[in-house]
Amino acid sequence: MSVSSTPTRLPNPYRPEGEIVSARLLALESALDWAAAARVAAPWVQAVRDNPPPFWAMESLLKEYPISSAEGLALMRLAEALLRVPDAETAIALTADQLGRADFDGSGDKVLARLSSTAIAMSKHFLPGAAEGSGILGKLGAKTVVAATLRAVQLLGRQFVLGQTMAEAMKEADVARKKAHVCFSYDMLGEGARTDKDALRYLQSYADAIEFIAARANKTGTLGENDGISIKLSALYPRYEDAHRMAVLDTLVPRVWTLCQAAAAANINLTIDAEEVDRLELSLEVLEALLVRVQVHCPQWTGLGLAMQAYQTRALELIEHLTALARKYQVKLMCRLVKGAYWDGEIKRAQELGLPHYPVFTHKHHTDVSYLACARALLAVPDAIFPQFAGHNAGTIAAILQMAAKTGAPFELQRLHGMGEGVFREVLKNPLIRCRVYAPVGAHRDLLAYLVRRLLENGANSSFVHQPVSYTHLR
């Protein structure tokens, strides 16, 4: 290992999957009563089935046109690209190309299917170059379809972005709070920085967001009752990778520390989002550098957090390391447990490199087992970690509640804005359960890349839209 390499803190992620899963299952044997969890979750699932989401909701759209079908892929590709098209003629051509590849004639007779089929049949009828659509009427028809599609895309966008600005987002958050006792973690939309100019722009965006949140935060109350912010380290430095470790520590850490200071002064939490497996060790080094500063300058602040991915083969070892860090620096950490959003990329990278194993679990049920094993481990260290469980599966939530009741450890549930509303409507009937909504904020043009990437990359495995309301099993 070269002098500039990131110190190894965790075991090799490329290990035999079967051995890891067997150990996780063994750890859960005495921790969970599966039948009891199923009984708790069953009425939540039935309530969601009895009160399905509206026809225009993303869950309905994906059920009608799943992204594993040609129709679903065409709609998602169109949604991702349409708002970035500079002129109407190109938009018409794009609509013609994408919708012309799919066949929606087999749709059912639901309202959504009828509306979608009508719009798409109309667009096919007026495709540029078609006999019926070659004249002015045809072009007007095609433009009408494009306009309608744009409106539909914007409607979908509003389901996943809380607001295009922080002011809009906080206004929407106030409306949501009237319906349920929830708080929010705001995420400023955008991909990783490509230049330092990008990084400084993202830094300012995060700083402005913290200022907005701070204006409404209770400075003397419980931190968990305030809204918070999520940040992406790759957005704050353009070469966030092990080969540039020293530059990361010299430049990125001070940038993140300025955000931490502002968050601590406002009594809000700041969570570092999870990224790719090969960046995890570097993220831990950044986290430890921040903990050194927190211990000295704001030891009373308990809002520094890290998101961790259950699909990683070394997720449990990560919890052990985070626990050791928290105890070493006497700073309680927040830990957001998620399934993971980069599955396809991790699998592809391991295949391209010819690695003997994968750094993530290759089966969805293995990730589910890992998630529950990680939840058990997080609940076992309340002195060091405050767990935040992100997910929308009724069975998983019931299992977490059961394990938490045994330990008495405090925790909160989290969901993604626009997803899981039906399940959480039932879960939050218990006023003692805390929920935080992960809420993207930004322009729709930024949302679409984020949304479609997650849909296309994760639709076939454990994504947040996979079987959202049709629970066929609870374990």
Residue spans for each PLM region:
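Short hydrophobic-acidic sequence motifs that mark active-site Asp/Glu residues
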Residues: S185, S230, M334
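N-terminal small/glycine-rich loop or linker at the start of catalytic domains
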Residues: T144-V153, K232-R239, R349-L353
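Conserved small/polar residues in nucleotide/adenosyl-binding loops
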Residues: T472-H473
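Active-site capping/gating regions of soluble enzymes
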Residues: Y237-T271, E275-V469
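Short hydrophobic/aromatic-rich motifs at helix boundaries and adjacent loops
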Residues: E29-L32, G141-V146, H181, I231, ...
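Metal-dependent enolase-superfamily TIM-barrel catalytic cores that perform enediolate-based chemistry
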Residues: L162-K179, L189-G190, T195-E276, S283-V294
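Extended, charge-enriched "interface" segments that sit outside catalytic cores
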Residues: S2-P52, M58-M188, A193, A199-G221, ...
